[in-house]
A protein has these predicted regions:
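Conserved class I S-adenosyl-L-methionine
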Residues: 48-57
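Class I SAM-dependent methyltransferase SAM/SAH-binding core
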Residues: 60-111
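A conserved beta-strand element that flanks and buttresses the S-adenosyl-L-methionine
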Residues: 123
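A short glycine-rich, Lys/Arg-flanked "PGG" loop and its adjoining helix->strand segment in the class I
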Residues: 135-150
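Acidic carboxylate diad motif detector
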Residues: 153-155, 159
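Conserved Class I S-adenosyl-L-methionine
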Residues: 164-196
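Core SAM-dependent methyltransferase catalytic element
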Residues: 193, 201-239
Length: 239
């Protein structure tokens, strides 16, 4: 699956759906598209399936997943913000919990301490554009995924190359906008590592609903799958 946010009309439809279903909205309006698309990728997962948020930031996506009913949640980030810890504490207080609603690890998404073949879905929301070594990230995520599990990625995107000044920093990190060529190379790298791209056709951009630092662009979402084990393949084929 490869999806591109096309315009404000599409974004408005996503927000309306999330509101109707009484799900928490992201503080950045455009990021609600990421969560809307992510929700589709979660449709076949059980509530207890282990899910890892790679680059969890302030925990907004972890909270979204929790509100969807998922119980086995793990977040990893280079720095653990006070906002994330405050959200944990508030949830524990409101729900009279003795344990936090999700586990948080400090570390790199390009070489984590997560055990191999232990995750049913890994996701990375607006993270890889901030100086991440994409090949190392893909390789380590492939390692931690169970056979047949998936990786969901969103990132900043525009079909043509957008020059980003080195002086622009986001969260103290470098920033880039992926173009069609970079996404194609990412998909090629994923295939070499062993992922099965669900779709190779990258949709065209019809609008730029995101503007930051004077640059207009959009978002792209990718869903990649680690192949199932040979025994699982035989079972699915009725052998």
């Amino acid at each position: 699956m490869i999806s591109v946010l096309q315009d404000w009309r599409e974004l408005g439809d996503c927000i309306e759906t999330l509101q109707r279903d009484k799900l928490p909205l992201h503080s950045t309006p455009q990021k609600n598209w990421d969560h809307f698309i992510l929700r589709k990728a979660l449709s076949q997962l059980e509530p207890g399936a282990p899910i890892a948020d790679l680059g969890c930031g302030h925990g907004l996506t972890l909270e979204f997943l929790r509100r969807l009913g998922f119980e086995n949640l793990l977040g990893i980030d280079l720095s653990i913000s006070w906002r994330l810890r405050a959200r944990e504490a508030l949830t524990m207080y409101r729900e009279r919990r003795l344990k936090p609603p999700y586990r948080i690890l400090r570390g790199s998404i390009s070489g984590s301490s997560i055990p191999a073949s232990s995750i049913s879905l890994a996701l990375s929301i607006s993270t890889i554009e901030h100086g991440v070594d994409v090949d190392r990230f893909l390789a380590d995520t492939f390692r931690i995924l169970e056979p047949g599990a998936r990786l969901f990625i969103t990132t900043d995107y525009w079909g043509e190359k957008v020059k980003v000044s080195d002086s622009i920093r986001a969260f103290g990190l470098p920033w880039r906008i992926f173009d069609r060529d970079r996404i194609s190379r990412l998909l090629d790298s994923a295939a070499r590592i062993g992922f099965e791209p669900s779709e190779n056709s990258i949709p065209a951009c019809s609008g730029a609903p995101v503007v930051w630092q004077g640059l207009a662009y959009t978002f792209i979402a990718l869903l990649l799958r680690k192949p199932p084990s040979r025994s699982e393949t035989h079972l699915s084929n009725g052998r």
